[in-house]
């Protein structure tokens, strides 16, 4: 028997989703301060696991720490239905070559795990 795909959770509220996307864009742009501010907003407005993961990322002492914590946060966000125009992307080199997902706007890769060093590394896996 084949496994049925898990039911997607409803879309995140706009304020939470927008704060996540702001943090993803800030990481892709190599901005620790902007990423931290967006994650603080996500932690303040969120609840449960999303709040815990966002706060852990916001509390990181440097951009590498935020990027490491962003992996689990992105997995949590990816469990929800995505608004139209957003995609789930994957970089095979992130997370010490174990790979990592993230949600982003559009289908032009904007890698939050490597920023300008490898901004376009990855592929869209779901739109």
Language-model features and meaning:
Residues 1-127:
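Intrinsically disordered, low-complexity terminal tails/loops enriched in metal-binding residues
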């Amino acid at each position: 028997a084949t496994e049925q795909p898990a039911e997607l959770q409803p879309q995140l509220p706009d304020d939470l989703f927008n704060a996540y996307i702001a943090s993803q864009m800030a990481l892709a742009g190599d901005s620790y301060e902007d990423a931290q501010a967006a994650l603080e907003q996500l932690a303040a407005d969120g609840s449960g696991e999303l709040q815990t993961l966002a706060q852990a990322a916001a509390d990181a002492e440097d951009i590498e720490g935020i990027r490491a914590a962003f992996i689990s946060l992105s997995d949590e966000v990816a469990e929800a239905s995505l608004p139209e125009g957003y995609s789930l992307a994957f970089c095979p080199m992130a997370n010490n070559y174990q790979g990592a997902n993230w949600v982003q706007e559009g289908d032009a890769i904007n890698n939050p795990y490597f920023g300008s060093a490898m901004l376009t590394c990855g592929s869209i896996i779901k739109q």
